[in-house]
Amino acid sequence: HAGWLAAASALASEYGAGPDLIYLPETDFDMPKFINDVKGVYAKKGNCLVAVSEGIHYADGGFVSEAKVEKTDGFGHAQMGGLASILAEVIKEEMDVKVRGIELNLLQRCGAHLASETDIEESFMAGKAAVENAIAGINGRMIAFERGIQNGRYACKTKLVPLMEVANVEKKIPRSWINEDGTGVNHQFIEYALPLIQGEPDLPKQDSLPRFAKLKKILAK
């Protein structure tokens, strides 16, 4: 479990927006500390926005999302919620304030129309390299990106890495990119992630709707 998506919410903070607190699975989660963190922000601002990775865990390795919220429906059946619901219930009980827990879940995977031009170009580049290498008879390898600087700007190219080096291996956010308090990321993460969201593609439309892709099944020869 890695917190790249949740950490990316910090990019908006560069412009005075974004969450007040960010919690990632790269650090151990502490519920009493979380409550105090929220109380501290709320006392100063009168509101608090928190971004949480679904993989956060306690020091003993147990996932916070595995906790049960002791809440029942009209029939007495236990209502099980996601991580946001669990944390929202905790804050509601501790602070007696209005709380809303929003589970992005699949929604964050349905926003391809919001992908940056950089993301689209690199995805195409990786797919092209994969097909070319497969046709060339190369296997047991995975396409990887190699970042660099070209003419003073971010640049990226593909390379092959042995599959055994990356299979079932998580690429976690370096601890040095997370602030000491464990409630956000620092400039090192921003410098890493910001180039990846550059560029706004001109998306084709049809009747003001995105022109949905319809792929043909063509066998490679």
Give the location of each predicted region.
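C-terminal non-catalytic interaction/assembly regions of soluble proteins
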Residues: 67-221
